[in-house]
């Protein structure tokens, strides 16, 4: 019943933003970037532009984000069953 979670890239412990890769197996991957909504509340935004993208597209997006911001944290969750539910709103 465990869901494997890995820190793929360690960012700045005080100010690094988070990119979350939810690996849904054959269904694809959801890539979510940590953002703030209009009220300043923490939220998530689809990084790949779509709800699910290919693993290759997810990795390309993540690499591009790390190149832009090396302080970024990247966390990957392997969840082909879709059990993990993101906390917070997706904008």
Regions of interest found by a model, annotated:
Residues 1-7:
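Phosphate-interacting basic helix/loop segments used at nucleotide- and nucleic-acid interfaces
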Residues 2, 15, 69-72:
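Sequence-level motif detector for i,i+2 pairs with an aromatic at +2
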Residues 7-39, 45, 74-79:
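Hydrophobic/aromatic-rich, well-ordered segments within soluble, folded domains that form packed cores
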Residues 35, 42-91:
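Helix-rich interaction surfaces within compact, conserved domain-sized segments
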């Amino acid at each position: 019943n465990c869901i494997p979670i890995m820190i793929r890239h360690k960012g700045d412990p005080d100010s690094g933003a988070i990119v979350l890769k939810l690996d849904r197996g054959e269904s694809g991957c959801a890539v979510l970037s940590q953002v703030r909504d209009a009220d300043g509340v923490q939220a998530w935004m689809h990084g790949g532009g779509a709800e699910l993208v290919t693993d290759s597209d997810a990795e390309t997006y993540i690499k591009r984000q790390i190149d832009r911001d090396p302080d970024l944290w990247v966390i990957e969750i392997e969840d082909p069953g879709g059990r993990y539910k993101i906390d917070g709103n997706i904008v």
